[in-house]
Regions:
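Negatively charged, low-complexity tracts enriched in Asp/Glu with abundant Ser/Thr
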Residues: 1-20, 81
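Intrinsically disordered, low-complexity regulatory regions of eukaryotic regulatory proteins
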Residues: 5-8, 22, 35, 70
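A structural detector for beta-sheet-dominated domains
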Residues: 14, 23, 39, 59-61
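Enrichment for repetitive, rod-forming helical segments
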Residues: 16, 23, 33, 66-69, ...
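A short, structured beta-strand/loop element
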Residues: 19-48
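Mixed-charge, Lys/Arg-enriched low-complexity segments
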Residues: 42-81
């Protein structure tokens, strides 16, 4: 199953820009699946997939910011009071 790049976009989250790559692939049964790679850093990516491009775009808009915020919180060092 080969992925075909169908679109590259920039996604802005809190003033920072992340590159996204949208792919289409055919399953063994011949149906289409869509996936998106959100490039957070050189070695850190979020990969999401869905049955339709419309629902994938909605999923990326909802989950990419949540992932960025959670990773930002996880990287902070907390001092117990």
């Amino acid at each position: 199953m080969l992925r075909k790049l169908i679109e590259t976009r920039d996604l802005e989250i809190d003033g920072r820009t992340y590159q996204t790559h949208y792919f289409e692939m055919r399953t063994v049964r011949g149906t289409r699946r869509y996936s998106c790679e959100v490039m957070l850093t050189a070695g850190d990516r979020i990969i999401l997939d869905d049955d339709t491009m419309t629902s994938l775009e909605a999923r990326v808009a909802r989950l990419a910011p949540a992932t960025v915020y959670s990773r930002e919180l996880a990287s902070r060092r907390w001092i117990a009071a």
